[in-house]
């Protein structure tokens, strides 16, 4: 069984997205946010008993790192970077602490904060252990257990990826999901009409968890999951490629993506912090794509590129 180190930062709520991005850029294998406002604004829909808690201007952001990463040095580096943010955010009440936990404890820790969440008009992400939540109207339920795949599907980068899939999928497409993680985007693609989906992740744990999550949902027979490094060695042509991973990794796959996307097809890239968006755009455009849509939520960007000779309606076209 693997052990993991965590770094928990208590900081002003306004710094939440910036600190989350900083922790992910530092190599975090997952981030969870504990905000008292979420409890105070929560409607008791599922019969749970919530703790008594007072409103605070602070949030707790916990990031997870493999045990073999030098946690003492990493903590010092993160503290230094946070200190440089003093001109932008209040550091009153700041604390940075570390902890060690087992794989089992981490997997269970997610469950305290993971509740059903309506992500788009039609898509709701539901924890696999919440059995009494039923769909209403056009609502489609994505049942998910994040396990060790580092994502519950509610992060802004995933939300924007889902919005992007809603925009480009019309039915019958072949889709490649690069860095599938929990498998949430692949499951969503089945609901949105994709005919065939190939999901890849370099992390064997993520591959296992994605397979388990996919089996929880209808349409799982359309999804094929395997371990792979980005799109290396892949020759499957696709109408849509989606990747929600770090910007520095995205730029490594733009040439392969252009090779594999069919004419008039789309490349969706998310997981991009604001100051690296131009780098990703340049990489995709140099490969031959045109930027069609740019979505921004807080510090995060999601980009929709198109492979087309017709530049009408394309940003910069």
UniProtKB/Swiss-Prot annotation:
Main location: cytoplasm
CDD domains reported in the protein's UniProt record: AdoMet_MTases
Xref: InterPro entries: Ribosomal_L11_MeTrfase_PrmA, Ribosomal_PrmA_MeTrfase, SAM-dependent_MTases_sf
Gene3D superfamilies membership: Vaccinia Virus protein VP39 (3.40.50.150)
GO CC term, one of those recorded: cytoplasm
Family as reported in the entry's similarity comment: Belongs to the methyltransferase superfamily. PrmA family.
Name of the molecule in the record: Ribosomal protein L11 methyltransferase
